[in-house]
């Protein structure tokens, strides 16, 4: 790939992060706020035409707006609690996306109508099918339709790991699939140009929850690099490619574009730097993961405690990396790439 093409695709932010990582290219959510925000450089739609090794774009989950004004980011990702959306923040983020010339990804989290957002989860899928959440669907999808740019909608993520965290994550794969299809059918009536993202956690049982090719345009998966867990479970420190490989193999069978929707790295400075270097030196994995289109860094502390004593890992990017991403625009890409 020529330097000129690389500049135009990666943008200044990714090139700046390459420099921070020591590599240069060759040639959450808080119910009180009601919304989370991710900024990405995702280009989720698959390329057409002659097959080639694609350039994986780099994004960042940035709930505190550390890089909100970066010209390097082309997609703004908004987590929306569908039964209690923060309309003020949604309006602000939509406006910011317009101002920055970005597309939108809306991650719709289908909590229940209960005061704790989770009670009645056993009835959630049936209630959706009976139209009891149509008001939420209409509001979200109407807003999506009003946005002038491209919109991606990610509904009910990490559904195949039953837990108390998400009421839609249940041992009811048939109910989930039916609810997903209902949501997409209703939403398409209002926002026919939107694209839909199915986003499992990546476990072996994910295929039971796949709702069908006709309602899935892309697949998202999370990847986490936690140094202490690596050593405890694998006896060594792993890297990005190894951590991604198994999950990628499980979802690539569907032939859809793949997004690392949430990527967090927590550990020593050297551990994090090694992950950054491997992620950003795409020559190491572009051909290994031909369907991979986007990697989105999770730039925040973990909002929930991990089991087995791992606590709440700090996934935030290094200060230097954030500064580089926030402070460089496309006009400075040439100096970084040359």
Regions found by a protein language model. Give the residues of each.
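Aromatic- and acid-rich polysaccharide-binding/catalytic face
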Residues: 73-80, 207-237, 298-300
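Hydrophobic faces of well-ordered beta-strands that scaffold small-molecule active sites
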Residues: 58, 76-78, 104-108, 151-155, ...
